[in-house]
Amino acid sequence: MSTSAAATLPLSVISKNLRKVFLSQKTRKIDWRYSQLKAIKKMMSENKDNITAAVKKDLGKHEFEIHQTEIVMIQTELDETISHLESWNKTEKVYSPLHFKPASSYILKEPLGVVLIMSPWNYPVNLALIPLIGAIAGGNCALLKLSRHSYNISKLLHGLLTKYLDPECFEFDCEGGAPYITELLEYKWDHIFFTGSVKVGKIVYQAAAKFLTPVTLELGGKNPCIVDKDTDIKLTARRLIWGKCWNAGQTCIGLDYLIVHKSILEPLIEEFKVVLKEFFGEDIKKSTSFARIISSAAAERLQQLFSMGKVVIGGEADIAERYIAPTVIVDPDLDSPLMQDEIFGPVLPIVTYENIDECLEFIQNRPHALTLYLFSRDQAIQDKVLDGTQSGSLMINDTLLHFTNPNLPFGGIGDSGIGSYHGKGTFDIFVHKRGLVQSTTKKFLDLPLRYPPYTPFSDNVAGKILGSGW
């Protein structure tokens, strides 16, 4: 039996209880929101070492990677939200047209209600807590479904969140599998925030459509990286290897494949070899700076990709230890899973091009990426790529860092997702902007010409008030 509170009661009861608490208006109070945000901050501060150890056990990541993505980013999001919550939540007075006078117009920021958040295993703290922070800031109740694949950190988070947060307003699950998720989607939620694969994202979207439930879908896909001939090969190689090997390539914004100018392919590959040795030593498997794959099954899937092109670097695997070496593949089969499916591992296929138009056509004929990368010092090339492509984000001459900026919207387009978040964007997802017009009851200000019977005079006056479009 699941240890989670969300699994010990029928979902019908959980849904009803959360709805009842929301309707009590408890979560609307700004003091309650601050108290819950500060509780998460306290939880992170008091349990940093335990969180680090649990993530390390699941993914084999170095403490540096864990701290940057699972600790620091949460602290940044909390600080940003706590500092600005009052101003974000403030009612806005907006201009009222002449025919409204003396009425006043406002935009209210109101909670959505009871929301469902479904988080993945690859960044199990970050991708669970940042949406939850937004849901709390917006004044909502929430059910958070943690991934059972990152079992150690999900189990720890389940216990900590249950301890630190208001138990009436939240439910957490860390063990429910596909049947539980299927049942979750049979209930009406006021918003669903899902992070995961395109395949499951489509299932979530279809289920939400039954209730016209709004969704945020943070998906993945194949993120291309263009490497122009006008680039610093040494610096480019360092940033590419760093971006591809962070979390052993298990990153939704990770570069999935390279499109390299034919003239620099060989020197770039040689520089990759130098950088890999510098970063991880002679035996990468022994390096504490290189993470492990989440499961043996995932490692086996990645190993199968080795045969779908020519391996020029790497190609080693230890399935029992969930180890896949950083592997570079040239001449990949374009119709194979290597070039059709999201890789989600340290396997990097390379295709080549000779002119930028050919390169852009290759990208345009594929689903829109969550992130597109470009390495080039040529401003004309940068402009052409920016104007000639669509993607959730575009990063030029570096990798991954855009994800850490709370002032940038993070999200996809098309197959890579719906909606964006981080910073104020996370708050905006979880509130409804409700229009309010407050009119007068003073009879002497009630213009008679608005009422029937209408006359040419009333039509003429209305035209002058409302403008030429009347």
From Swiss-Prot:
It is an enzyme of class 1 (oxidoreductase). It holds the Pfam family Aldedh. NAD(+) binds at G196, S197, V198, K199, V200, G201. The keyword Glycoprotein does not apply. Its EC number is 1.2.1.5. GO terms for molecular function: 3-chloroallyl aldehyde dehydrogenase activity; aldehyde dehydrogenase (NAD+) activity; aldehyde dehydrogenase (NADP+) activity. The active site is at E218, C252. GO terms for biological process: aldehyde metabolic process; sorocarp development. It catalyses: an aldehyde + NADP(+) + H2O = a carboxylate + NADPH + 2 H(+); an aldehyde + NAD(+) + H2O = a carboxylate + NADH + 2 H(+). One of its GO terms (cellular component) is cytoplasm. It is found in: Cytoplasm. It comes from the Eukaryota. The keyword NAD applies. Belongs to the aldehyde dehydrogenase family. This is Aldehyde dehydrogenase family 3 comG. It comes from Dictyostelium discoideum.
